[in-house]
Amino acid sequence: MYGFFKTMALAVVAAATVGCATVKRSAAPAGEKRCAWEKGRRERPVTTDAVLCYGGSHHRTPFLWDGKRLAPYVTYTDEEGREQWLFDGFIFLEFVDASRPDGRTYAFETGNRNAPAAGKEQWQELIAYFFAEGNCIDALDKSVAEAERRIGRAPTRRRVVVMLPDPVIHRMYADTTATTVYWGELDGRKLDFSRNEDRIAACKWYIDSVRERFAAGGYEHVELAGFYWIREIVTRPQDTEYSYHLTRSDIMLPHIAEYLHGLNCSLDWIPYYGSRGYDAWRSFGFDQVYLQPNYYWKPQNDMDDVFRRIGELGVGLELEFEPTLLAGRKGSEAFRERFRAYMRHAKETGVYGSRPIAYYHGTNGFYDLWASPDAEDRELFHELCRFIVGNPLRGERAE
């Protein structure tokens, strides 16, 4: 499998642009490079209920997001046998590639002190994974097509958001003596990530490569809505000198956001409660932002304050769970109660129906809940799906 995606990655370099203006590796304004679907947008697309789909790292089981795995995320069949559209957004993301056949590990974000940062080759492999036939985006497009044959046309194309790797300054994140010239070449020149313009150039190259592959796919049932910033903190000069020196988010992200906005694409982000920069998200250029309460793992977190901050900041909510809530797992009753607290607080505070929601479920938690034959798990699954399909925000956004 690794060899397949490595071979596929080579195609990223020479990917032909279909439906887009020729994407040159230059400083041309983003508006001059818009694809047909980007030109036709009146506004940047948003989602009401987006599910996080972690994939790309060899340590994950299952490894692929094929049609069989994606089907329960596309539609929901209720207790009366009625099939309905479920998630309208799919965020494909990864933060590390571990357990690789070559024995190496690469990090796609700052903060990893144990693995070297991914370079251009690993970024290409990640793109190849997302766009492989029968996987991720291609599988989603086909799954939606199959569902439309059963229940009719979806209200909107399912919206895809693809992660944007973090151009880590030093090859080893926390080692300031490690090289900053490790990523690879663009236009015949080795990039140096000590230079902000080179980090931005790498991100633009990745964005354009994803857009090219998406255009070449000819997808009819999904659209590329935007990109997801993988690091859960952003920094400003007032942060500690150490962390700011290693990230410099404030001088890079606004340029990336401006580029994406010129393409009518969004820049999305999911910081955790209390993380650096989460209260200044607009200054970095983010569009759709969700706050992680982390209550599922840290019940000491004050949910009343979390939802107060959501209201004050004008952001959405990330609803969080893992397979640890499945019946028979140690401590599952406590995890179920915490999970239900998210939905309860969302309704009581008015977040439900007014703010977008993202759904974290680990690697395969939602699928495991769907597949469980246990009566308690089935009850919880239906409760969650009713929460999603009944989201009042869908009607307001023509969903």
Q: What residues fall within each predicted segment?
A:
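Substrate-binding cleft of secreted/luminal carbohydrate-active enzymes
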Residues: 272-276, 288-399
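Aromatic-lined carbohydrate-recognition surfaces of secreted/lumenal glycan-active proteins
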Residues: 156-169, 190-206, 224-231, 256-278
